[in-house]
A protein has these predicted regions:
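A short, gly/pro- and small-residue-rich
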Residues: 131-139
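Generic detector of short alpha-helix boundary/capping microenvironments
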Residues: 12-13, 137, 175, 257
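Exported/periplasmic ABC-transporter solute-binding proteins
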Residues: 26-85, 92, 96, 101-108, ...
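Residue-level signal for mature regions of secreted extracellular proteins and peptides
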Residues: 18-19
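C-terminal motif of bacterial Sec signal peptides marking the signal peptidase cleavage site
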Residues: 22-24
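Bacterial N-terminal signal peptides that target proteins for export
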Residues: 2-14
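Periplasmic-binding protein-like
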Residues: 114-119
């Protein structure tokens, strides 16, 4: 079974996305507080332009949607917004990015300040539906995360199970960073994978639990943790690595876990305010067009009976 795709394939596709970002996003997507999305230039890659996205009538007057989004969308969401604005130039979008729990706490305390909430799990939107009055929709799933075993120290050319097994057999000291499974679907998936591979009991003393997925990646990327279970989107979109400097070596530093070897990492959202305009963007986000871009950015598409994406076959 193949556990990793060639890095060149991923990065060729990611170069399309980076080109779109540089061409179409005038405001920085690294600002955690907010980013305004503007019309994308004609240099946007053909892959991000499709005829399969729904096109509703754009509001005649300019409207602003305020989106609260999980931090692992920081690279790809501005690209999607820029493409969305090709059809809906009168809908301006402001994005607030934050780690999963911090984002939930912010939105839950100030639901009137946001129109769409895009969480990193399914739990928080359900809680929002129960606790916030006047919510405008039921939770919806907008993407599915991919789990990888990542290391800045160790090259990995075999399966993730064999990699960790061999370290245990050789009695080598190592540490493994995992996001807190109490509030992060990525942590739940990582623990479940270890259990399924009969590794959890032996590796448990070596686990370092982190409060956020960003912290898990930072700890592993800095080498303070030898290994970490992170999202593929984080590895492909390393901070300060827009030039994709490690194209030739990065593929040896991560292994993609088979998607059927751990519980699905489903990321849900919910509409809080401005339901009509918000629904236009949500429909776009769930379209084949947007799901294709999300797939290139390291996510798995949400497949339906009519989805024609290769990843859905």
């Amino acid at each position: 079974m193949t556990f990793n795709q060639p890095a060149s394939n991923f990065f060729n596709r990611m170069l399309f996305i980076v080109t779109a970002l540089m061409a179409g996003c005038n405001s920085s997507n690294n600002n955690q507080n907010s980013t305004a999305a503007n019309n994308q230039s004609s240099k946007e890659p053909a892959k991000a332009i499709s005829t399969n996205a729904p096109v509703a009538s754009s509001p005649k007057a300019t409207e602003t949607l305020r989106i609260a989004a999980f931090s692992n969308l920081r690279m790809v969401l501005p690209i999607l917004v820029s493409d969305f604005n090709h059809n809906y130039p009168n809908i301006k979008i402001q994005i607030t990015f934050a780690p999963n729990t911090a984002l939930y706490n912010t939105v839950n305390a100030n639901p009137q300040s946001f129109d769409i909430y895009l969480s990193g799990n399914q739990t928080y939107p359900k809680q929002m539906l129960a606790s916030v009055k006047g919510v405008k929709s039921s939770p919806f799933t907008y993407t599915r995360g991919q789990l990888v075993l990542y290391s800045h120290k160790y090259p990995m050319d075999i399966s993730p199970t064999t990699t960790l097994d061999q370290l245990m057999l050789d009695n080598k000291p190592f540490s493994l960073a995992i996001a807190n499974p109490e509030n992060l679907a990525y942590g739940v998936a990582a623990e479940a994978w270890l259990v399924n591979q009969n590794l959890y009991n032996n590796i448990k003393p070596k686990i370092i639990y982190t409060n956020t997925l960003d912290e898990t990646f930072a700890l592993t990327d800095s080498g303070k943790a030898d290994f970490g279970f992170v999202s593929l989107s984080q590895v492909l979109n390393k901070p300060n690595n827009i030039a994709l400097q490690n194209v030739n070596t990065l593929s040896n530093n991560y292994l993609i876990l088979p998607k059927n070897s751990y519980p699905p990492i489903l990321q849900d959202g919910i509409i809080l305010n401005h339901p009509n305009t918000s629904q236009i963007f949500v429909d776009y986000l769930k379209s084949v067009k947007a799901q294709d871009v999300l797939t290139d950015a390291g996510f798995l598409p949400i497949c339906t009976s009519t989805t024609i994406l290769p990843a859905c076959k």
